[in-house]
Amino acid sequence: MASLDDPGEVREGFLCPLCLKDLQSFYQLQSHYEEEHLEDRDVKGQIKNLVQKARKAKNKLLKREGDDRVEPGTQGYESFSYGGVDPYMWEPQELGAMRSHLSDFKKHRAARIDHYVVEVNKLIIRLEKLTAFDRTNTETSKIRAIEKSVVPWVNDQDVPFCPDCGNKFSIRNRRHHCRLCGSIMCKKCMELIGLPLAHKLTSASKDSLSTHTSPSQSPNSVHGSRRGSISSMSSVSSVLDEKDDDRIRCCTHCKDKLLKREQQMDEKEHTPDIVKLYEKLRLCMEKVDQKAPEYIRMAASLNAGETTYNLEHANDLRVEVQKVYELIDALSKKILTLGLNQDPSPHPNTLRLQRMIRYSATLFVQEKLLGLMSLPTKEQFEELKKKRKQDLEQKRTVERQAALESRRKLEERQSGLASHTANGDVRSLRGIPPPLRKAEGWLPLSEGQGQSEDPDPLLQQIYNITSFIRQAKAAGRTDEVRTLQENLRQLQDEYDQQQTEKAIELSRKQAEEEELQREQLQMLRKRELEREQEQFLAASLQTRTRVLELREVIPFQLEASRGPHIDLSYSLDQDSSPVQSSTAPDILTPGSALAPMHLWSGPPALGQETLPQSTMSQQSDKASLNPFDEDDLSSPTEGAISPAAVEAFLGPPAAVTKEYNPFEEDAEEEEVAELGAGNPFTDPDSPAPNPFDEDDGPRPASPAAPGNPFEECPSTNPFEVDSDSGMEAEEHIEEELLLQQIDNIKAYIFDAKQCGRMDEVEVLTENLRELKCTLAKQKGAPN
């Protein structure tokens, strides 16, 4: 790890990742980190990140290089051999500058292997050409010509010295050419290849070696004969004329390559002695695995007194198995002592392998030999057969007695059925347990005759077996109790499984029903939401249309306001919201007619519809007095605003009492200024006459249409009621109507803001402010 102070310094060892202190071992580093840097919790995350990065880099490096990147020594193994310590918990050493030579190594290795293989193949091919003809019966000149045709020889003048030993060539030190590569060497460096070795290398099997080998052609015999001939010769010419027709001259390098090839062939075809012995050992073990189970079955049957197997055959099989065990022991001992007396002692790994084979064979013999059962003698086998025969007879007797006892109990039960009473109760058999006898069967009594059967057959079976268990316990039949308890457990498990499946099926059906209901509810909500949106859009459009129409009609109908004042209840019926009409049927009272803002109720709320005129006409007492049935222009029609409504929106006449007029502020002054001399109420000093009080003089407006209910006698005029009683009724209803009107106008303001109609927002805001002022004044006025 590089130090922070000196970037060029490289430090190695067990360094602390925080203080860079060099510790001597892994455990010292761990203890130092736990003691000194225990409080540095923030560094833990950084260390984990570094460890993860190093691990990724290591995995990438190992993935790229594979198994070829192996560090020498056993330090890597020892660092992982400590149990309970994870080296990845600590920060590893930083990977220094490195360079992979794997590609170069593979390239050089492939070239070297190719060179070796190609060269060896060339030598074998040339050797095969040199041995393809009969060298003993061919002339020397022809042999020399054939050898030169196989490989070109190097020129003698080009090589003055021997390439191997460096001696100078002369008359005594002649030049010799290698018949396989064509190079030149001296006689000392020359090698000879015998024909047997040549045929062995060129042939596909060793049979060629025995075919071409003879005592006269062996290398030792030939060499010895040549040596004798050389010793017998005294002249130099005889040495120069020496013929080696039965052998092939070659250099040391070619001879070494051919010898390595021969060694590879021998190793490939040779089987070591330990392998042969181990194969025999495995065959013996497999034979024991086949014979031992068969012998165990035979011994168990014979010891039980059965006559299925023959005693003599079992004895023969036992002897055979024992002999195989002895052979296994002998082979394992031979493997253990193999090669111990040889001069070059075997490799320690070979000796260890031999010891483990011996140990494995010993364990095998002990395990199998201890499992062998002894066979009875002939006398013992006869006694066992007699004893088994007696047991079988006794068993048959017991079974016959059990059958007779069960038949007797069945007859008793059938006879006991006749003693039943009228209501079906059993008196003779109930409550009296059967006597317990030795060597007899037992049969439980059914207790479900006087009880209603359960619709579920499993429950009925459980009840019956429970009753049988009680009877078996009372009778002391432990075997039957265990059997019945096992049957009861199985029935209970089956019943529990059945109930679980039913519960799962029921829950699944309920879930499907809930899902269907949820989908239907969502569909209904979606439809309701769409309907509300449509109504909201329609109401918004109607509100905007009415406000715009009102703003356009008000200037043109100001003059018409001086005409006859139609009863305010008409405009109330025309512009009142359906909430007021539906919730208060008696809202058309004299007190409600004087409501100041009832004339401007705005459009209907969301999800509501305006009542048609036919519905409003049905609420009147007399159908003949319905003003909506006539075509008089003075009567207001649907979608038009009456003069009384305009007058009520702009401000009531001056004759109305001041404390009950919510629009007597600036709106009245603006109206007086606009009307001028044509307005009968232009005189501010004179008291404003009340248009609702009857006057003896003629009215300035045109007479009302015949049949108008607003021109009836004073006794039926709702505006001529007693002032005290009218104020009391008006005060309670006005407050409720004003609050409802305030809520409606707030909703209209919200809708106008959402739609971006700021002109309507200003108008509605002014109306809302006036309504609030009126409500405050009415609450503060004395009763």
From Swiss-Prot:
A zinc finger (C2H2-type) spans 14-37. Residues 387-399, 405-414 have a biased composition (Basic and acidic residues). Residues 263-499 are annotated as: Necessary for interaction with RAB4A. A zinc finger (FYVE-type) spans 156-259. GO terms for biological process: early endosome to Golgi transport; Golgi to lysosome transport; protein transport; regulation of Golgi organization. Residues 263-783 are annotated as: Necessary for interaction with EHD1. It is found in: Cell membrane; Early endosome membrane. Residues 627-783 are annotated as: Necessary for interaction with RAB5A. Residues 663-673, 721-733 have a biased composition (Acidic residues). GO terms for cellular component: cytosol; early endosome; early endosome membrane; plasma membrane. Zn(2+) 2 binds at C178, C181, C251, C254. The modification Phosphoserine is found at S3, S214, S218, S225, S229, S686. The modification N-acetylalanine is found at A2. Residues 227-239 have a biased composition (Low complexity). Its main location: membrane. Interacts with EHD1, RAB4A, RAB5A, RAB22A, RAB24 and VPS45. Binds simultaneously to RAB4A and RAB5A in vitro. Interacts with RAB4A and RAB5A that has been activated by GTP binding. This is Rabenosyn-5. It comes from Mus musculus (Mouse). The gene is Rbsn.
